[in-house]
Curated annotation (Swiss-Prot):
One of its GO terms (molecular function) is 4 iron, 4 sulfur cluster binding. Keywords: 2Fe-2S, 4Fe-4S, Biotin biosynthesis, Iron, Iron-sulfur, Metal-binding, S-adenosyl-L-methionine, Transferase. It catalyses: (4R,5S)-dethiobiotin + (sulfur carrier)-SH + 2 reduced [2Fe-2S]-[ferredoxin] + 2 S-adenosyl-L-methionine = (sulfur carrier)-H + biotin + 2 5'-deoxyadenosine + 2 L-methionine + 2 oxidized [2Fe-2S]-[ferredoxin]. Its cofactor is [4Fe-4S] cluster; [2Fe-2S] cluster. Binds 1 [4Fe-4S] cluster. The cluster is coordinated with 3 cysteines and an exchangeable S-adenosyl-L-methionine. Binds 1 [2Fe-2S] cluster. The cluster is coordinated with 3 cysteines and 1 arginine. Residues 64-292 form the Radical SAM core domain. Residues 1-21 are annotated as: Disordered. [2Fe-2S] cluster binds at residues 123, 155, 215, 287. Catalyzes the conversion of dethiobiotin (DTB) to biotin by the insertion of a sulfur atom into dethiobiotin via a radical-based mechanism. GO terms for biological process: biotin biosynthetic process. This is Biotin synthase. Residues 1-12 have a biased composition (Polar residues). PROSITE patterns: RADICAL_SAM.
Length: 346
């Protein structure tokens, strides 16, 4: 694959609302990475790569703290899309039943419990292709206001958004919006056909233009090549503004999905991906996301050494398992790592 391989619509992901603070001296924040440069980093001897990532991480994030994010499925199943990894797609027989949107009080009760357990960001996910105006969206806005009233950051992942919907979410107090690219532009068509890469970039641009922080990452272990992994990270890093949060997910192969036979992601691959993300996007929160239940404590700590400073926290990530609250808090205590406080926003 030539170094000049690029996304035709990279310029569409150029929102100007979020401007990161100037980086510390000696930290290089770039937006012009070539594929060969990214791959050279990814393929460094592992200890050299982790050392380089940790050096960058320490220059930007001086405290031994991680952001704890709780994720709740507020509308489960019945999604009309065909994402090959997703058990919530209506066309796959995965045992996930379509449910109605949760009631606002139930969501806020879950948020309150997550806060009591130590989470500072509460993310609400709905299995929709796109947001539609009406009573359900009004309920989501009420959920956002309620989460913010609890003193937590509020995040949502609801599918594609219009400009006016993004603006209304911001007015309700939404802190961040998650909309992953999932994989490289080249591999994307093998995973999803019902939404284009450009659709995703366009939604991210609308989120930024509304003044909402972007949470955007991807999934490894979906049959992609090393070049695909590197080009996903390159696509994220070469945007005009790096995402505020970059979730790195390891595929959880669910029976009934087209990717059910995929092999478990090796720890070394996860560490390399996280470390490379940290070097490319020094000021972003790099989130250790799905697949953590398959990792032992040492593997998770190695990911943190490589630059992960955010965790999805709680017993379930939408429909897949995750370590229990008590396990995570015990792990952090053993490692001398403390939870990061929620950001104070205007």
């Amino acid at each position: 694959m030539p170094d000049t391989a690029t996304v035709s619509s990279e310029s569409e992901f150029s929102g100007h609302a979020h401007v990161a603070a100037p980086p510390p001296a000696g930290v290089d924040v770039r937006h012009d990475w070539s594929l060969s440069e990214v791959r050279a980093l990814y393929e460094l001897p592992l200890l050299d790569l982790v050392h380089k990532a940790q050096t960058v991480h320490r220059a930007v994030f001086v405290d031994n703290k991680v952001q704890l994010c709780s994720l709740l499925s507020i509308k489960t199943g019945g999604c009309p899309e065909d994402c090959s990894y997703c058990p919530q797609a209506a066309r796959y027989k995965t045992g996930v039943k379509a449910e109605k949107l949760m009631a606002v009080p139930d969501v806020l009760d879950a948020a309150s419990k997550a806060r009591a357990a130590g989470a500072t960001r509460f993310c609400m996910g709905a299995a929709w292709r796109e947001v539609k105006d009406g009573p359900q969206f009004d309920s989501v806005l009420e959920m956002v206001r309620g989460v913010r009233a609890l003193g937590m950051e509020a995040c949502a992942t609801l599918g594609m958004l219009s400009e006016s919907q993004a603006k209304r979410l911001r007015e309700a107090g939404l802190s961040a919006y998650n909309h992953n690219l999932d994989t490289s532009p080249e591999h994307y068509g093998d995973i999803i056909s019902t939404r284009t890469y450009e659709d995703r970039l366009r939604t991210l641009n609308r989120v930024r233009d509304a003044g909402i922080s972007v949470c955007c990452g991807g999934i490894i272990g979906m049959g992609e090549s090393v070049d695909d992994r590197c080009n996903l990270l390159r696509t994220l890093a070469n945007q005009e503004h790096h995402p505020e949060s970059v979730p790195i997910n390891a595929l959880v192969a669910v029976e009934g999905t087209p990717l059910q036979e995929q092999q478990r992601v090796e720890t070394v691959d996860m560490v390399r991906t996280i470390a490379t993300a940290r070097i490319l996007m020094p000021q972003s929160m790099v989130r250790l996301s799905a697949g953590r239940q398959q990792m032992n404590e040492e593997a998770q700590l190695l990911c943190m050494m490589a630059g992960a400073n955010s965790l999805f926290f709680g017993e379930k990530l939408l429909t897949t398992g995750n370590p229990e609250y008590t396990q995570d808090m015990a792990l952090l205590e053993k490692a001398g790592i403390r939870p990061l406080e929620p950001r104070q926003e205007g």
